Amino acid sequence: MTDVRDPDISDSPPQSMEALGFADQFLVWSVRVWAQSNNPDGTAPSHYYKLMREAFAKAGLKDTHLVFDRFMSLFTIALKRPLVFHAPNCSCLSRQELFSVRLVANAQNDMLPCALGNLETYIAATGVRPTMNALMEFSQDFAREGILLEQVPDLEGPENKFRPGALRGDMANVTVH
């Protein structure tokens, strides 16, 4: 049997930030900065908000940081599973960071049933609709500015398996390391 797959397309997930394209890196960095602003590290949260606001503006997304903040807030308030995000300058990738790339890519590519199903895996049913609305709004803003995310495979392995988590209404389910 002849292998007709494109040799430039990998079935394996990216293992580091460097393996991602710019749009994917920008989203992962944004998620990390947002998470860091909500997990005290001795730096004032306003520092991270300012950093994100400036980065979004430079990318042509002047007010999108507000919609992104709304999405992340709604998403984390309705969490039913713990999340792990790396520090903004870390080269590693977590399963949840790749999930965020796939989620936005699904929204940008009109794969809404897939995006909806993925959201339902992570958040309580009561949070799905408002979170999906915010996701659609900021992912369309990204697309209008040419920030198009790629479909990336999921990470596998025991270190990335979910731990059972109770529904939480705070940032206790979000870890930055």
Give residue spans per PLM region:
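Polar/charged low-complexity regulatory segments
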Residues: 1-101, 105, 109-177
